[in-house]
Amino acid sequence: MAKLTKRMRVIREKVDATKQYDINEAVALLQELATAKFVESVDVAVNLGIDARKSDQNVRGATVLPHGTGRTVRVAVFTQGPNAEAAKAAGADLVGMEDLADQIKKGEMNFDVVIASPDAMRVVGQLGQILGPRGLMPNPKVGTVTPNVAEAVKNAKAGQVRYRNDKNGIIHSTIGKASFSAEQLKENLEALMVALKKAKPATAKGVYIKKVCLSTTMGAGVTIDQATLSAVAN
């Protein structure tokens, strides 16, 4: 059996895997254990009571976190005409049509989010095999195919997170950095929970939010007592 590192021993001693933690206690514990030489992200895994095999029960969407994610997001926009100027004014890092598509085909992908106006999808459609596997393909369900590209750029820059369940019905997302205050992380988590509840499929039966677990990049998972989140998130 592999020998536990000192860090992992400390985590095992401090984290009770059988306990549901108060949100404030959980955040304080994660911050105490976030001792990596870089600022760790705080991630969340939400187990949903859905049947991920059924397309009408899949959950996907996007929401802007009130305190952002702590990441600098580079945004590429496929559009033209007045929309191109609006996208640049909103802070887009790359704006174009065929010229931008050519860059991507050459492997130049210095961006984190791709947004497109509907008229640009004829160009973006050629990039499905490149953007799709990377989770970058624009989609109207998450607001990245839209006539209002300027608003989409502002949302992306402000800390919008996109989410979709995996094959096990689990949503994985980030809610900030370990350097955030406990209140900022709590409010970001609550904003995500509100969005997930609004996205509940009509055909989902039984308990919808089964489990909420927080972790840092290099740390262990901590299960959250949902009753300690604000009423609007419950």
UniProtKB/Swiss-Prot annotation:
GO terms for cellular component: cytosolic large ribosomal subunit. The gene is rplA. One of its GO terms (molecular function) is structural constituent of ribosome. The lineage of its organism: Bacteria, Pseudomonadati, Pseudomonadota, Gammaproteobacteria, Enterobacterales. It comes from Edwardsiella ictaluri (strain 93-146). InterPro entries: Ribosom_uL1_bac-type, Ribosomal_uL1, Ribosomal_uL1-like, Ribosomal_uL1/biogenesis, Ribosomal_uL1_3-a/b-sand, Ribosomal_uL1_CS. PROSITE patterns: RIBOSOMAL_L1. Gene3D superfamilies: 3.30.190.20, 3.40.50.790. This is Large ribosomal subunit protein uL1. It comes from the Bacteria.
